[in-house]
Structure formats: structure tokens, C-alpha cells
Amino acid sequence: MAAPVRRTLLGVAGGWRRFERLWAGSLSSRSLALAAAPSSNGSPWRLLGALCLQRPPVVSKPLTPLQEEMASLLQQIEIERSLYSDHELRALDENQRLAKKKADLHDEEDEQDILLAQDLEDMWEQKFLQFKLGARITEADEKNDRTSLNRKLDRNLVLLVREKFGDQDVWILPQAEWQPGETLRGTAERTLATLSENNMEAKFLGNAPCGHYTFKFPQAMRTESNLGAKVFFFKALLLTGDFSQAGNKGHHVWVTKDELGDYLKPKYLAQVRRFVSDL
């Protein structure tokens, strides 16, 4: 029994030594590969963080005929299956006391509040008649003022800004160049901070970019060490504030997904449309 056990132990020891040699060789080759990899600082591509700032709808969209029919059906079912509210029970009780009054079976103390529920209903009716719904079509819609945030209230709006690239004015999403030591989301947050004198507050949707776009600089600006830029987009929902008009009139617009094509270049538009939602 001792001989087979000894042979087994020797075989295991030999296999372990071979594994150690292979693993050491693998580690050395990996270290060489990492050492040979070029540094990202020498890349001819500049990194940019862009902000896809969206204003969500502030009113619901008009119902379609099918939705109206379904809503009416659900409301009718709710009425038929619901229980009486406290006010309805009170009104029923007062109706019974009114019937007793007609039959001279009431107490004089009940006369003071016998019509209280009806008085409340009359008051609520007057308030309802005085209430007026806000207009869905705003003044900005009538003037087609796309610099105003008070337009297309039932649609999702996206902020675009006009920047100068070489001798061309180009519409893009707000962006800034990445700086060492910050994350790409941090770059997008810095972009938001520089807009409208820091008076806009937004909620970023995650730490990962929702899209990217690569472009080359114009020939006049392009060099071997500066070929172009890679843009990474980050979504954010506008909470408060607006883009300041001071000194920037005509340099920004709030547009729907359908209106993006009026401003963006075709290739840039194709990338942006992938992640812009139209709620």
C-alpha cells in the first residue's frame, strides 16, 4: 500500500511544480504586455462629456378615442362598485331628517344644519364653475419660440446649444472636455454647472453614458496627435431653472425629438436619436 501512495504523492508534487512554472511564465508575459501598452495620455483622440438635458412633460397628452372610451368604462365600474363616502352618508341622513320634518316628526334643533351638506355641494359647484383649465397651447407655441421652456407642455424637450467649430456654427448637445482626475459623468455635471450661470438643477440618470459619438476635426485643425474627439452622452432630467438668455439669445433651443433634425448634422442626429425618448 505504501508504494502506490508514494507514487501518487510524487505525481501530485510534480504536477504542482509544472503548474507553478506555467503560472510564473503567464504572469511574466502579462506584465510585458501591460508594459508595452501605450499610455492613454498619448491618444490622438480627445474625450468629451456631453449633457442630454431633458425637460419631461408637465401635462398629460390628450386621450385618444380608444383611451377615452376605456377611461369612461373604468369610471362607470368604479361608481357602480364603490361604497358611499362620508359626505354621501351625511347627505342621505339629512334627507331622512328632511322627510321627518315634512311629517312633523323632527326636532327644532335639527333645523340649523339640515341643509348643511347641500350648502357644501352648492359652494363646491360654484368653485368648480370658476375654475379654468390652463391652456395647452402657450404663447411660445403660437410664436414658435423654441428658446422658451414653456412650450410643447405634453412633450419631452431636449436642450441644444450652438457652438463654433472652426469657421462653422454647429448645433450640438452641451459638452465639455474631460479633465484628468474627474469621471466622464463629472465632466457632464461640470457642463451643467456652466450653463445658465449655475441656476439649473437636474437629476442625472446613472453613472454610465447612454451613448457615444466619434468625429474628426476639420482638416485645418487636424494633426497626427489631434485627430478628433470621442463624445460620451449622459442623460439628466431638468428639475428647476432655465437657460439664461443673457448674452446667449439665439444660442440655445428646447426641441422635441421630431425637431432635432432641424438642427443636428445627420450622423450626429443618428446617434442622439438612439437614446432620446419621446414620452
Curated annotation (Swiss-Prot):
Query: Can the keyword Ribonucleoprotein be found in this entry's annotation?
Result: yes
The alphabetical list of record keywords is: Acetylation, Mitochondrion, Ribonucleoprotein, Ribosomal protein, Transit peptide
The keyword rRNA-binding is assigned to this record: no
**Which positions does the record annotate as the modified residue N6-acetyllysine?**
230
An example GO BP is:
mitochondrial translation
Main location per the UniProt record? mitochondrion
The superkingdom of the source organism is Eukaryota
User: This chain belongs to which protein, by name?
Assistant: Large ribosomal subunit protein mL46
Partners and quaternary state? Component of the mitochondrial large ribosomal subunit (mt-LSU). Mature mammalian 55S mitochondrial ribosomes consist of a small (28S) and a large (39S) subunit. The 28S small subunit contains a 12S ribosomal RNA (12S mt-rRNA) and 30 different proteins. The 39S large subunit contains a 16S rRNA (16S mt-rRNA), a copy of mitochondrial valine transfer RNA (mt-tRNA(Val)), which plays an integral structural role, and 52 different proteins. mL46 is located at the central protuberance.
Family in the record: Belongs to the mitochondrion-specific ribosomal protein mL46 family.
Tell me the compartments it is located in.
Mitochondrion
Q: Name one GO molecular function term.
A: structural constituent of ribosome
Q: Which cysteines are joined by disulfide bonds?
A: none
Question: Which residues fall in a coiled-coil region?
Answer: none
Of the GO CC terms on this record, one is: cytosol
